[in-house]
Structure formats: C-alpha cells, structure tokens
Amino acid sequence: MGELQTHMQLQTDTIHEGVRKENWFAKAMNIKVGIIPLPVYALLFILITVFVMHHDVKSDILTSIAVMAFFGFTFAQIGKSIPIVRSIGGPAILATFIPSAVVYYHLLPNDIVKSTTEFTENSNFLYLFIAGIVVGSILGMKRETLVKAFMKIFIPLIVGSVTAAIVGLAVGTLLGLGFQHTLLYIVIPIMAGGVGEGAIPLSIGYSDIMPISQGEAFALVLPSIMLGSLCAIILAGLLNRIGKKKPEWTGNGKVDRSEEESPALEESQSGQQMFNLSLFASGGILAVSLYLVGMLAHDFFGFPAPVAMLLLAVLIKLFRLVPASIENGAFGVSRFFSTAVTYPLLFAIGVSMTPWDKLVAAFNLSNIITILSVVVTMMAVGFFTGKWLNMYPIETAIINACHSGQGGTGDVAILSAAERLELMPFAQVSTRIGGAITVSLTLLLLHQFY
C-alpha cells in the first residue's frame, strides 16, 4: 500500500512539474537566434567581448565552437529576417560573404579572425562536415534509388557542362573579353572544382604551358570562381523558392522520382533507432573512418579523399555491409551536422577561405554577364535534362549548380541556400569528379594545341 501511495505521489509530482508555469527566464530560453536560446546568446556575446578585450580568444575547440556558433547564427538570422534576401538563400549568403567583407575591411577583431582561421585550417572542420553529410546521406538512401540516381546524374552534368561552356564562350567573346581569356580565365575556372582542386592546379598548368607566372594566372582565375559560386548560391535559393510554389518539380532532396518515403527509415525496425546515442556514435565513427581511408587513397594514389570516401559509402550501401540500425545512426549524424553545424561552418569559410577582394575584382559588367550565362545555362540544362530523365528537375539543376561552385565550401553554401544538404553526395560527384575532368582535359588540350 505504501509503495502504491509513493507511486501515485510521484505521478502527481510529475504532472505538476509538466504543467508548471514558466518564469520569465524559462520563457526567454524559448526565444532563439538560430538554435541558440536568447539568454545563452547574450552570455556568448558578453564572453566573446571579454575574451577580445583581453586578447585571449583561443583557437581550441571550445572557444571556436562558441565563436563560430555566435557569429554564424547571427548572420544567418539576419539573412532570414530580410524579406527579399531570404528568398534567394539569404542565410547562407550572409553567413558566408558578410564575414568575408568584414574581415577585408578590418571590422572584425583580429583575435576572432586569427582564432577562427587557425581552427578551420588545423582541424579539417570542413571535411568532418562533408564526411558526416555524405556518408549519412548515402547510407540513408534506398539501394535502388542510389544506383539509378548515380547512373543518371552524369547525363545532365555532362550535357550542362558542354552547353554552358559553349554559351559562356559565345557571350564572353561577343562582349569583347576575347575567346582565349573567356575560355581559360572565366569558363574553365567556374567548372574546375573550386580553389584547392581547381584554381591552383589550373594556374600551375597555365604557368608551365603559357608565358605567365603561376601567381598572375591564379589572380586571373580566382575571381571567376568566387563570383560563379555566388551566382550559384543565389540561383539555388531562387530554385528553392520556386520548388515551394511548384511542388511537382521537386523531390525536396530526393533526386529520382522512383524514390518514395523518407529513405533513412526504409529498413528501420523502430523509429527510435535514429535517436539511439550509441548508434549515432557508431554512424559518426563510420563516417570519420571512411574519410581517413579516403585520405590514404589520396596519399598513395592521388585520388581525391572525398570521392574515395563517397565510393566506399556507396559500396557499403550496395552490398549491405552494415546493419540498418547503423545506417540510421549515420543518417542521424548527417541531420545533426545540417541542423547545428552549417551556419557556424559557413562563417568559418567566409573568414578563412573566401577572399573578398577576389570576389569584388570580378564585378565588372562583362564578367558578371558572362559568368551568369555559364551558371544559368548549366542549371537550366540540368533542369530540363533531369525532367526528361524522369528525375526531379529542381534537384538536378541544384546538383549542376555545384559544378560551378567554390569546391567543397561552395557545395555547403549552395545546398544550404537550397535547403537540400542531403544532395551532398551528388554535389561531391559534380564538384570533385566534374572538376577533375575539367582541369585534366583543359591542361591536356592546352598542352597539345598551344
């Protein structure tokens, strides 16, 4: 009897606890800037201010998380609050390019810039994000969809790239930029796969073949990459808006029309599995391990680490090498990164990897029109080719947009603007494989005919 009374008392206490009135502080905790409760946001502001005043902003993981979360979600929230801007990927644009501008104009404390840059460069933070998103997205797909989508996606990518190159060359030449300049310093760089795997090998190759220094070539190549990426981000945001008005054109992250329900739960024995912390951790370790294998592939064979990781994840999915429970855990990791890490990462990218002066250097009318013609053509061809192949046209257009982005950093920004980070595996194919083919063919042909 005593045990029954105790049990009933506990139930009563629980009910009272559930219906208790919230005080003003608890209510304030429900107001958020991004995912940060307002009181915590205010505390972070005070802490960061104190650290800056004492020149004590460290580049360790704890301080870096606080700094990047504070600024990343601040700029994203501003982007979400501006009516027109939020419709064209405003949160991603502001979280990336405003930090770049404030660094260039020395409006951000140097201690913040230094700590963020050191953490980003030394921690491989970007590739941890890509590993979590790519592996989780692939393991969350249906096997049949995975095969169909990867087989089909090369068609709009190839057709879009060739058509965009032709249109870009025609537009640039007509605007007086010259055939050679348009091809080598505008069209090819846009599709080269970013800075590390595009601009740098291109500029080295140009300097070996033509009478130009590597530094001069790099300075000519980089602005087109930056502006091309910005155009792709804005257009991806517009496509997201169009998709909300024309739902029949989009799979909301699914690529092939044969894909039906949420892929991550296709073989789940229980909806609770995704939230099992042990499985979540297993999925995260799997993603990290696959990326490390990719790094070895790069060291021994020169194969891009993200592509090797992607191929391994595809093989694991195709041959069912891990149980469905761990697949769901990996999918949970990708959801965590897309929800909590995207905007802090974009802030870090803006501070440490996006030179504002190079972006501004491309801002003349002829360059803008030519670059825009390349990106628009690539996305438009992706849209209509995808539709013809019975794929979701908005998704195929967004994947094609990643071929005109800033490499891995551009993929994150473009897919964030489009609100489709689950397309990261296809974006990596578009960026890494498409970029490598573009650079290799360009230098091979240039060597033969220059």
Swiss-Prot record:
> Cellular component terms, GO, for this chain's entry?
plasma membrane
Keywords (A to Z) from UniProt:
Cell membrane, Citrate utilization, Membrane, Symport, Transmembrane, Transmembrane helix, Transport
Coiled coil: which residue ranges? none
- UniProt effect for mutating R432C: Loss of citrate uptake activity
Pull the Cytoplasmic topological domain ranges from the record: 1-32, 86-87, 140-152, 239-273, 317-335, 386-428
Query: Where does the UniProt annotation locate this protein?
Result: Cell membrane
> Which residue stretches belong to region Disordered?
249-268
* Keyword Transmembrane appears in the UniProt entry: yes
Primary role: Proton motive force-driven secondary transporter that catalyzes the uptake of both citrate and malate. Is an electroneutral proton-solute symporter: the number of protons transported is equal to the valence of the transported anions. Translocates the free citrate and malate anions. Citramalate binds to the transporter, but it is not translocated. Is strictly stereoselective, recognizing only the (S)-enantiomers of malate and citramalate.
According to UniProt, the name of this protein is Citrate/malate-proton symporter
Protein's organism: Bacillus subtilis (strain 168)
Q: Which gene encodes it?
A: cimH
